[in-house]
Protein backbone atom coordinates (compact mmCIF):
# COMPACT_ATOMS: atom_id res chain seq x y z
CA UNK A 1 0.00 0.00 0.00
CA UNK A 2 1.38 3.43 -0.98
CA UNK A 3 1.60 6.37 1.37
CA UNK A 4 -1.21 8.17 -0.46
CA UNK A 5 -3.54 5.23 0.06
CA UNK A 6 -2.71 5.16 3.77
CA UNK A 7 -3.44 8.88 4.06
CA UNK A 8 -6.76 8.48 2.26
CA UNK A 9 -7.70 5.60 4.58
CA UNK A 10 -6.85 7.71 7.64
CA UNK A 11 -8.96 10.59 6.32
CA UNK A 12 -11.87 8.21 5.78
CA UNK A 13 -11.52 6.93 9.34
CA UNK A 14 -11.51 10.52 10.64
CA UNK A 15 -14.60 11.30 8.57
CA UNK A 16 -16.39 8.24 9.91
CA UNK A 17 -15.54 9.19 13.49
CA UNK A 18 -16.75 12.77 12.99
CA UNK A 19 -19.89 11.60 11.18
CA UNK A 20 -21.03 8.61 13.23
CA UNK A 21 -19.57 8.62 16.73
CA UNK A 22 -20.90 12.00 17.97
CA UNK A 23 -24.43 11.20 16.74
CA UNK A 24 -24.47 7.71 18.27
CA UNK A 25 -22.97 8.99 21.51
CA UNK A 26 -25.59 11.75 21.68
CA UNK A 27 -28.44 9.27 21.16
CA UNK A 28 -27.00 6.96 23.82
CA UNK A 29 -26.71 9.77 26.37
CA UNK A 30 -30.24 10.99 25.64
CA UNK A 31 -31.61 7.46 26.12
CA UNK A 32 -29.71 7.01 29.38
CA UNK A 33 -31.10 10.31 30.66
CA UNK A 34 -34.63 9.19 29.71
CA UNK A 35 -34.19 5.92 31.60
CA UNK A 36 -32.83 7.85 34.58
CA UNK A 37 -36.01 9.93 34.71
CA UNK A 38 -38.23 6.84 34.51
CA UNK A 39 -36.23 5.06 37.21
CA UNK A 40 -36.45 8.12 39.45
CA UNK A 41 -40.24 8.22 39.10
CA UNK A 42 -40.55 4.53 39.97
CA UNK A 43 -38.30 5.04 43.00
CA UNK A 44 -40.41 7.93 44.23
CA UNK A 45 -43.62 5.88 43.92
CA UNK A 46 -42.03 2.92 45.70
CA UNK A 47 -40.73 5.17 48.48
CA UNK A 48 -44.15 6.77 48.98
CA UNK A 49 -45.88 3.37 49.26
CA UNK A 50 -43.18 2.14 51.61
CA UNK A 51 -43.84 5.02 54.00
CA UNK A 52 -47.59 4.40 53.85
CA UNK A 53 -47.04 0.67 54.31
CA UNK A 54 -45.14 1.05 57.57
CA UNK A 55 -47.40 3.85 58.81
CA UNK A 56 -50.56 1.74 58.38
CA UNK A 57 -49.07 -1.69 58.96
CA UNK A 58 -50.97 -2.38 62.20
CA UNK A 59 -54.35 -1.50 60.67
CA UNK A 60 -53.82 -3.39 57.39
CA UNK A 61 -55.22 -6.83 56.73
CA UNK A 62 -53.00 -9.67 55.56
CA UNK A 63 -54.34 -9.28 52.03
CA UNK A 64 -53.61 -5.52 52.00
CA UNK A 65 -50.11 -6.14 53.29
CA UNK A 66 -49.48 -8.69 50.55
CA UNK A 67 -50.77 -6.36 47.82
CA UNK A 68 -48.71 -3.42 49.11
CA UNK A 69 -45.57 -5.52 49.34
CA UNK A 70 -46.12 -6.97 45.84
CA UNK A 71 -46.67 -3.47 44.44
CA UNK A 72 -43.37 -2.22 45.89
CA UNK A 73 -41.57 -5.28 44.52
CA UNK A 74 -42.86 -4.52 41.01
CA UNK A 75 -41.68 -0.92 41.26
CA UNK A 76 -38.20 -1.93 42.39
CA UNK A 77 -38.05 -4.56 39.62
CA UNK A 78 -38.84 -1.80 37.11
CA UNK A 79 -36.03 0.34 38.53
CA UNK A 80 -33.66 -2.62 38.16
CA UNK A 81 -34.81 -3.11 34.56
CA UNK A 82 -34.08 0.53 33.70
CA UNK A 83 -30.65 0.22 35.30
CA UNK A 84 -29.86 -2.87 33.21
CA UNK A 85 -30.88 -1.01 30.05
CA UNK A 86 -28.59 1.89 30.93
CA UNK A 87 -25.67 -0.48 31.47
CA UNK A 88 -26.36 -2.16 28.14
CA UNK A 89 -26.40 1.18 26.29
CA UNK A 90 -23.19 2.34 27.99
CA UNK A 91 -21.49 -0.97 27.16
CA UNK A 92 -22.52 -0.68 23.50
CA UNK A 93 -21.11 2.84 23.31
CA UNK A 94 -17.88 1.64 24.89
CA UNK A 95 -17.56 -1.14 22.28
CA UNK A 96 -18.20 1.38 19.49
CA UNK A 97 -15.49 3.74 20.72
CA UNK A 98 -13.08 0.85 21.21
CA UNK A 99 -13.66 -0.39 17.65
CA UNK A 100 -13.20 3.08 16.17
CA UNK A 101 -10.04 3.64 18.21
CA UNK A 102 -8.66 0.25 17.11
CA UNK A 103 -9.37 1.02 13.46
CA UNK A 104 -7.66 4.39 13.71
CA UNK A 105 -4.60 2.91 15.41
CA UNK A 106 -4.42 0.26 12.68
CA UNK A 107 -4.44 2.91 9.93
CA UNK A 108 -1.92 5.00 11.85
CA UNK A 109 0.44 2.02 12.06
CA UNK A 110 0.12 1.42 8.31
CA UNK A 111 0.88 5.09 7.70
CA UNK A 112 3.98 4.99 9.91
CA UNK A 113 5.26 1.77 8.31
CA UNK A 114 4.88 3.16 4.78
CA UNK A 115 6.31 6.51 5.84
CA UNK A 116 9.53 4.84 6.97
CA UNK A 117 9.89 3.20 3.55
CA UNK A 118 10.00 6.53 1.72
CA UNK A 119 13.60 7.54 0.83
CA UNK A 120 14.67 10.88 2.22
CA UNK A 121 14.90 13.55 -0.47
CA UNK A 122 18.42 15.06 -0.70
CA UNK A 123 18.70 18.74 -0.03
CA UNK A 124 19.17 20.75 -3.22
CA UNK A 125 20.55 24.29 -3.30
CA UNK A 126 18.11 26.91 -4.57
CA UNK A 127 18.47 27.69 -8.28
CA UNK A 128 17.98 31.09 -9.85
CA UNK A 129 17.24 29.50 -13.26
CA UNK A 130 13.71 30.32 -14.46
CA UNK A 131 13.28 26.73 -15.70
CA UNK A 132 13.67 25.26 -12.21
CA UNK A 133 10.97 25.77 -9.61
CA UNK A 134 12.38 27.01 -6.31
CA UNK A 135 10.72 26.68 -2.93
CA UNK A 136 10.54 29.92 -1.04
CA UNK A 137 10.02 30.22 2.70
CA UNK A 138 8.07 33.05 4.22
CA UNK A 139 7.61 33.81 7.90
CA UNK A 140 4.15 35.21 8.49
CA UNK A 141 3.58 38.15 10.75
CA UNK A 142 0.37 38.87 12.64
CA UNK A 143 -0.54 41.61 10.19
CA UNK A 144 -0.39 39.52 6.99
CA UNK A 145 -3.56 39.32 4.89
CA UNK A 146 -4.56 36.06 3.18
CA UNK A 147 -1.41 34.35 4.42
CA UNK A 148 -0.83 31.61 1.83
CA UNK A 149 -1.48 33.80 -1.23
CA UNK A 150 0.03 37.12 -0.14
CA UNK A 151 3.46 36.37 -1.67
CA UNK A 152 1.96 35.46 -5.05
CA UNK A 153 -0.20 38.56 -5.12
CA UNK A 154 2.87 40.73 -4.75
CA UNK A 155 4.78 38.79 -7.45
CA UNK A 156 1.89 39.02 -9.91
CA UNK A 157 1.57 42.72 -9.25
CA UNK A 158 -1.94 42.68 -7.88
CA UNK A 159 -3.35 45.87 -6.49
CA UNK A 160 -3.53 46.32 -2.76
CA UNK A 161 -6.88 45.34 -1.28
CA UNK A 162 -9.20 48.18 -0.25
CA UNK A 163 -9.55 48.79 3.47
CA UNK A 164 -13.19 47.64 3.34
CA UNK A 165 -12.16 44.24 1.97
CA UNK A 166 -9.46 43.94 4.62
CA UNK A 167 -12.02 44.65 7.34
CA UNK A 168 -14.33 41.94 6.01
CA UNK A 169 -11.44 39.48 5.73
CA UNK A 170 -10.33 40.28 9.28
CA UNK A 171 -13.83 39.57 10.58
CA UNK A 172 -13.93 36.13 8.95
CA UNK A 173 -12.49 33.16 10.89
CA UNK A 174 -9.01 32.11 9.70
CA UNK A 175 -8.98 29.25 7.19
CA UNK A 176 -7.46 26.05 8.52
CA UNK A 177 -5.12 24.03 6.34
CA UNK A 178 -3.64 20.51 6.29
CA UNK A 179 -5.33 17.25 7.26
CA UNK A 180 -4.84 18.04 10.95
CA UNK A 181 -6.84 21.29 10.66
CA UNK A 182 -4.61 22.82 13.34
CA UNK A 183 -2.90 26.20 13.41
CA UNK A 184 0.63 25.42 14.55
CA UNK A 185 4.17 26.71 14.15
CA UNK A 186 5.55 24.57 11.34
CA UNK A 187 6.89 24.91 7.80
CA UNK A 188 4.18 24.23 5.23
CA UNK A 189 4.20 23.16 1.58
CA UNK A 190 1.46 23.77 -0.95
CA UNK A 191 -0.21 21.09 -3.08
CA UNK A 192 0.11 22.01 -6.77
CA UNK A 193 -3.51 21.06 -7.44
CA UNK A 194 -5.45 24.38 -7.38
CA UNK A 195 -8.59 22.45 -6.44
CA UNK A 196 -7.02 20.73 -3.42
CA UNK A 197 -9.37 20.74 -0.44
CA UNK A 198 -6.64 21.59 2.09
CA UNK A 199 -4.09 23.51 0.01
CA UNK A 200 -1.22 23.73 2.49
CA UNK A 201 0.32 20.95 4.60
CA UNK A 202 2.63 20.90 7.63
CA UNK A 203 5.95 19.14 7.13
CA UNK A 204 5.48 17.18 10.37
CA UNK A 205 2.01 15.97 9.33
CA UNK A 206 3.21 14.49 6.02
CA UNK A 207 6.62 13.33 7.26
CA UNK A 208 8.55 15.73 5.03
CA UNK A 209 12.01 16.99 5.99
CA UNK A 210 13.10 18.87 2.87
CA UNK A 211 10.96 20.13 0.01
CA UNK A 212 11.14 18.19 -3.29
CA UNK A 213 12.76 19.83 -6.32
CA UNK A 214 9.70 19.52 -8.56
CA UNK A 215 5.95 19.79 -8.19
CA UNK A 216 4.40 18.25 -5.09
CA UNK A 217 0.90 16.82 -4.68
CA UNK A 218 -0.64 15.57 -1.44
CA UNK A 219 -2.26 12.49 -3.05
CA UNK A 220 -2.34 10.69 -6.38
CA UNK A 221 -5.86 11.99 -6.87
CA UNK A 222 -4.68 15.60 -6.50
CA UNK A 223 -1.77 14.87 -8.84
CA UNK A 224 -4.17 13.62 -11.52
CA UNK A 225 -6.45 16.64 -11.10
CA UNK A 226 -3.54 19.09 -11.12
CA UNK A 227 -1.92 17.63 -14.23
CA UNK A 228 -5.30 17.54 -15.97
CA UNK A 229 -5.81 21.23 -15.19
CA UNK A 230 -2.37 22.08 -16.61
CA UNK A 231 -3.10 20.03 -19.75
CA UNK A 232 -6.39 21.85 -20.32
CA UNK A 233 -4.83 25.29 -19.89
CA UNK A 234 -1.09 25.02 -20.77
CA UNK A 235 -0.80 28.76 -21.26
CA UNK A 236 -1.74 29.28 -17.63
CA UNK A 237 0.66 26.93 -15.94
CA UNK A 238 0.36 27.29 -12.14
CA UNK A 239 3.08 29.23 -10.39
CA UNK A 240 4.73 27.79 -7.33
CA UNK A 241 3.60 29.32 -4.06
CA UNK A 242 6.40 27.53 -2.28
CA UNK A 243 6.73 27.13 1.46
CA UNK A 244 5.80 29.19 4.44
CA UNK A 245 6.50 29.22 8.14
CA UNK A 246 3.19 29.02 9.98
CA UNK A 247 2.99 30.59 13.44
From Swiss-Prot:
GO terms for cellular component: NuA4 histone acetyltransferase complex; nucleus. Residues 115-168 are annotated as: Disordered. It is found in: Nucleus. Its main location: nucleus. One of its GO terms (biological process) is cell fate specification. Expressed widely, including in the two ASE neurons. A zinc finger (PHD-type) spans 175-224. Gene3D superfamilies: Zinc/RING finger domain, C3HC4 (zinc finger) (3.30.40.10). It comes from the Eukaryota. Zn(2+) 2 binds at residues 191, 196, 218, 222. Keywords: Metal-binding, Nucleus, Zinc, Zinc-finger. Zn(2+) 1 binds at residues 178, 180, 202, 205. One of its GO terms (molecular function) is zinc ion binding. Required to initiate and then maintain lateralized gene expression in the ASE sensory neurons. Involved in determining cell fate in the ASE neurons. PANTHER family: ING FAMILY MEMBER LSY-13, INHIBITOR OF GROWTH PROTEIN. Belongs to the ING family. This is ING family member lsy-13.
